[in-house]
Amino acid sequence: MNFETYFKISYGLYIVTTQSGDKKGGYIANTLFQVTATPPQFAISCNKDNYTADLIKQSGVFGFSVLSEKANPALIGNFGYKSGRDFDKFAGVNYFTGKLGVPIVTDSSVAWFECKVNQSYEVGTHIIFIGEAIDNGLIDEKGKSLSYNYYREVLKGYSPKNAPTYIDKEKIEAITNTVKQQAEVWQCQLCHYEYEAVKGDPISGIAPGTSFLDLPNDWVCPICGADKSMFEKE
């Protein structure tokens, strides 16, 4: 199997959210797509172990925010690499409550939808929820939607382990070893973000050419917020 072929499939990046009672949930999704035009229906694939999956089953509703190409990586890390069971992902995040009672995130987003679940299917490790769009809106009419390819190539992020598109990092490393041998690359062991000295970290104001060892002691991963001790040299 050539695992590089999986990265040729195009995806967007979204924050899928829901609420059941007083419990809110949300996660980063790239497997989300429109399946019918009339009525407008969308499918999402959610890991069975995700806290949000339980809340969607309870509430029967979900919403999603279409992330901007200029999305704050910390927001992606917040919803993508932490569990809502023991962490309030919505603290400090701008959102509003939609018609169906779904918390809709507006930060770093260009548009949003709110859906009522019509069907669901169990597919191995994941559940596919199909929901009819009940309401939607634009947040940034001129903003560009964030693609997974941009997230991976520019922001150096990877799918978390529970994502349906997750590929074991050892298989990815086999593809990228040649490039890594030519540059200083340090990888976050939590989210697999890669710090490349030749590029620096423009998000945190780190200039290109800055060695990882010369980074400030308070520097953290721009994706998941892990400190320097969580990085290993590739």
Regions found by a protein language model. Name each.
Residues 188-191, 221-224:
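Short cysteine-rich clusters marking metal-coordination/redox-active sites
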Residues 17, 196, 216:
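Residue-level detector of conserved, well-ordered beta-strand and adjacent loop positions
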Residues 203-218:
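Short linker/helix segments within small regulatory modules
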Residues 182-184, 217-218:
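Short metal-coordination and nucleic-acid-contact micro-motifs, chiefly zinc-binding Cys/His arrays
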Residues 158-173, 189-207:
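Short, charged low-complexity linear segments at domain edges
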Residues 197-198, 229-233:
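Short, non-ligating residues that shape and space the ligands of small metal-coordination modules
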Residues 1-181:
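Basic, polyanion-binding surface patches
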